[in-house]
Amino acid sequence: MSGNTGERSFADIITSIRYWVIHSITIPSLFIAGWLFVSTGLAYDVFGSPRPNEYFTENQQGIPLITGRFEPLEEQNEFSRRSQ
C-alpha cells in the first residue's frame, strides 16, 4: 500500500468550484489568444515562415526540383538566377 503525499486527488481538483471558476476563464482566453495570433498573421512574423501567398514568385509557380544527378550545383544556380 502506498503512502499519502498530502496532495489532493485529481477527482477532488476537477470537481471543485474553484477549479472551474479559474479554468472557465483561462481555457477560452488561451484559445482566443491562439486564434488571434494565427489569424492576424503574427505567427508568420514571429516564426519567420512565409505567408501562403509568398511561397512562390510570379515567374516560378512550382518547386525547384533538381533532376540532374551529376550537375546539381549548376541546376541550383539556375533556379537561383530565375527566382531573382
UniProtKB/Swiss-Prot annotation:
<keyword id="KW-0472">Membrane</keyword>
<comment type="subunit">
    <text>Heterodimer of an alpha subunit and a beta subunit. PSII is composed of 1 copy each of membrane proteins PsbA, PsbB, PsbC, PsbD, PsbE, PsbF, PsbH, PsbI, PsbJ, PsbK, PsbL, PsbM, PsbT, PsbX, PsbY, PsbZ, Psb30/Ycf12, at least 3 peripheral proteins of the oxygen-evolving complex and a large number of cofactors. It forms dimeric complexes.</text>
</comment>
<dbReference type="GO" id="GO:0009767">
    <property type="term" value="P:photosynthetic electron transport chain"/>
</dbReference>
<keyword id="KW-0408">Iron</keyword>
<dbReference type="GO" id="GO:0042170">
    <property type="term" value="C:plastid membrane"/>
</dbReference>
<keyword id="KW-0349">Heme</keyword>
<dbReference type="InterPro" id="IPR013082">
    <property type="entry name" value="PSII_cytb559_asu_lum"/>
</dbReference>
<dbReference type="Pfam" id="PF00283">
    <property type="entry name" value="Cytochrom_B559"/>
</dbReference>
<keyword id="KW-0604">Photosystem II</keyword>
<dbReference type="InterPro" id="IPR006217">
    <property type="entry name" value="PSII_cyt_b559_asu"/>
</dbReference>
<dbReference type="InterPro" id="IPR006216">
    <property type="entry name" value="PSII_cyt_b559_CS"/>
</dbReference>
<dbReference type="GO" id="GO:0005506">
    <property type="term" value="F:iron ion binding"/>
</dbReference>
<dbReference type="InterPro" id="IPR013081">
    <property type="entry name" value="PSII_cyt_b559_N"/>
</dbReference>
<keyword id="KW-0479">Metal-binding</keyword>
<dbReference type="InterPro" id="IPR037025">
    <property type="entry name" value="PSII_cyt_b559_asu_sf"/>
</dbReference>
<keyword id="KW-0602">Photosynthesis</keyword>
<protein>
    <recommendedName>
        <fullName>Cytochrome b559 subunit alpha</fullName>
    </recommendedName>
</protein>
<dbReference type="GO" id="GO:0009539">
    <property type="term" value="C:photosystem II reaction center"/>
</dbReference>
<dbReference type="Pfam" id="PF00284">
    <property type="entry name" value="Cytochrom_B559a"/>
</dbReference>
<feature type="transmembrane region" description="Helical">
    <location>
        <begin position="21"/>
        <end position="35"/>
    </location>
</feature>
<feature type="binding site" description="axial binding residue">
    <location>
        <position position="23"/>
    </location>
    <ligand>
        <name>heme</name>
    </ligand>
</feature>
<dbReference type="GO" id="GO:0042651">
    <property type="term" value="C:thylakoid membrane"/>
</dbReference>
<keyword id="KW-1133">Transmembrane helix</keyword>
<comment type="function">
    <text>This b-type cytochrome is tightly associated with the reaction center of photosystem II (PSII). PSII is a light-driven water:plastoquinone oxidoreductase that uses light energy to abstract electrons from H(2)O, generating O(2) and a proton gradient subsequently used for ATP formation. It consists of a core antenna complex that captures photons, and an electron transfer chain that converts photonic excitation into a charge separation.</text>
</comment>
<dbReference type="GO" id="GO:0009055">
    <property type="term" value="F:electron transfer activity"/>
</dbReference>
<keyword id="KW-0934">Plastid</keyword>
<keyword id="KW-0813">Transport</keyword>
<comment type="similarity">
    <text>Belongs to the PsbE/PsbF family.</text>
</comment>
<keyword id="KW-0812">Transmembrane</keyword>
<dbReference type="GO" id="GO:0020037">
    <property type="term" value="F:heme binding"/>
</dbReference>
<keyword id="KW-0249">Electron transport</keyword>
